């Protein structure tokens, strides 16, 4: 039934369309880009209005080069592979095995071709030698241990670039030279080698650190054969710190929830620091992007983003983790089974950073070359300006790595170290130094072990074992990095 019109209500005519000059159509007003601040003739209109025609997008340039990388599950290599493949490089990566989170990450990366195997070979043992293990971590030539030339040759097939960080598994010097020879034969255009110093070459009074001296000799060989090369020297890894009983960088968890770091370094001598997992990759990538024109000719680059004394390192680490961290200058304690080659390295390191030296100015430069050390962190920041410092690492990453390694302190209640204030009690350099002096004197007077590796109950004369053994003691067994090369 039609609605009844009440005569007492006034009738209103339907509204007319009001025409406004230059008004937009309704459908245009509804579009999110229709109210552009640019005129229709503006060349920027196509950037601000999706209704206008725009040319097809140009494809992003993708690197067409392949990079050869060894020890791909190690900290330096894995960091580099992440960033290099993210921007389109292809990587040919050698790995000892495919076990662990990092190896899985690398091997499942679509831009990575994995070559699984050792860089060394072992001869079939004679009948009289069967059942005996060979320690493949010793410095220098090892009887029965050779170089896997077939794998090395295959690694460089089709590669134009190379990032090489050798380790002490096998004869590092022979392997390093074989890698350089293969790279030259393959026509590699830029060879970046992760080197370290031979301190004895800089000062005859300084001992060589065997595992570093091997790298130094490989560096000399790379220069000798004329590959376009750059050499990077990495500082102390932030992520070396662990509550697990590994030597040199063990942060020993105390009953009150604090930590003690004991090492032979002078408490007031500056040391270079680097977050290997976060910062090596971007820095190496920039070296390749800049090319040999800028970084070739055998240039050395110190990769370190902070110069901190042990006392300063403990201070910033304490701020990050929220608990007291104290430094004790003392001998390196070895409480787990370690490869013999690494044991020899630690003994030499104690001799180099002499516990009896009371003058921080007399401590040898970590990188051997004082000028290289003075370039920190300027040279590294020229490559990568977004580093993760030790404090940030301690706050954001250290608890996660500790939990992945089976530790639980981060989820347990912490009473603040018996009510002591962290800032007042442990961020004061003078109080830390008093603690260092007391501890050092105690060990000298009672233990009689100053300047020597503390055996920790491990028989150094025990039968040498192959590095493949699951009982090395230096392979983290947690989920986070079960396969990472120690200090690689």
From Swiss-Prot:
InterPro entries: NAD(P)-bd_dom_sf, NmrA-like, NmrA-like_oxidored. The keyword Oxidoreductase does not apply. One of its GO terms (cellular component) is nucleus. Changing residue 2 to K: Loss of function. Residues 14-29 have a biased composition (Basic and acidic residues). Changing residue 386 to C/S: Few, very slowly growing transformants. Residues 1-45, 422-488 are annotated as: Disordered. It is found in: Nucleus. Interacts with nit-2. This is Nitrogen metabolite repression protein nmr. Residues 438-459 have a biased composition (Low complexity). Residues 412-488 are annotated as: Dispensable for NMR function. NADP(+) binds at residues 71-76, 165, 215, 237-240. Changing residue 386 to D/R: Loss of function.
């Amino acid at each position: 039934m039609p609605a009844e019109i009440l005569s007492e209500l006034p009738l209103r005519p339907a509204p007319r369309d009001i025409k406004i000059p230059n008004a937009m159509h309704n459908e245009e007003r509804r579009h999110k880009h229709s109210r552009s601040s640019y005129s229709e003739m503006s060349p920027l209109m196509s950037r601000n209005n999706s209704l206008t025609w725009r040319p097809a997008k140009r494809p992003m340039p993708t690197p067409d080069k392949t990079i050869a990388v060894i020890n791909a599950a190690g900290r330096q290599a894995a960091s580099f592979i992440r960033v290099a493949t993210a921007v389109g490089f292809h990587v040919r990566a050698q790995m000892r095995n495919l076990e662990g989170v990092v190896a899985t990450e690398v091997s499942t990366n679509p831009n990575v071709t994995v070559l699984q195997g050792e860089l060394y070979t072992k001869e079939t043992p004679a009948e009289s030698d069967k059942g005996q293990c060979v320690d493949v971590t010793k410095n220098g030539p090892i009887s029965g241990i050779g170089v896997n030339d077939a794998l090395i040759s295959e690694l460089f097939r089709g590669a134009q670039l190379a990032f090489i960080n050798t380790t002490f598994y096998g004869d590092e010097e022979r392997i390093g030279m074989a890698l350089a020879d293969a790279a030259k034969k393959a026509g590699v255009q830029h060879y970046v080698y992760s080197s370290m110093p031979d301190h004895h070459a800089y000062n005859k009074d300084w001992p060589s650190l065997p595992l570093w001296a091997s790298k130094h000799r490989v560096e000399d060989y790379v220069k000798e054969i004329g590959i376009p090369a750059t050499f990077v020297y990495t500082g102390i890894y932030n992520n070396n710190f662990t509550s697990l009983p590994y030597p040199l960088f063990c942060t020993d968890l105390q009953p009150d929830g604090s930590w003690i770091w004991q090492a032979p370094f002078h408490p007031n001598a500056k040391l270079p620091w680097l977050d290997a997992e976060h910062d090596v990759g971007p820095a190496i990538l920039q070296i390749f992007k800049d090319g040999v024109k800028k970084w070739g000719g055998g240039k050395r680059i110190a990769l370190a983003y902070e110069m901190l004394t042990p006392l300063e390192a403990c201070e910033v680490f304490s701020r990050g983790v929220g608990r007291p961290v104290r430094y004790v200058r003392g001998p390196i304690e070895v409480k787990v089974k370690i490869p013999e080659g690494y044991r020899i390295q630690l003994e030499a390191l104690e001799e180099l950073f002499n516990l009896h030296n009371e003058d921080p100015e007399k401590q040898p430069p970590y990188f051997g070359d004082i000028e290289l050390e003075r370039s920190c962190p300027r040279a590294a920041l020229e490559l990568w300006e977004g580093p993760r410092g030790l404090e940030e690492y301690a706050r954001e990453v250290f608890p996660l790595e500790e939990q992945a390694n089976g530790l639980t302190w981060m989820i347990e209640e912490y009473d603040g170290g018996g009510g002591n204030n962290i800032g007042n009690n442990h961020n004061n350099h003078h109080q830390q130094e008093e603690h260092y002096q007391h501890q050092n004197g105690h060990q000298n007077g009672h233990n009689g072990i100053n300047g020597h590796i503390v055996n920790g109950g491990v028989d150094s004369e025990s039968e040498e074992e192959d590095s493949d053994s699951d009982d090395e003691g230096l392979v983290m067994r947690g989920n986070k990095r079960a396969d990472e090369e120690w200090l690689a």
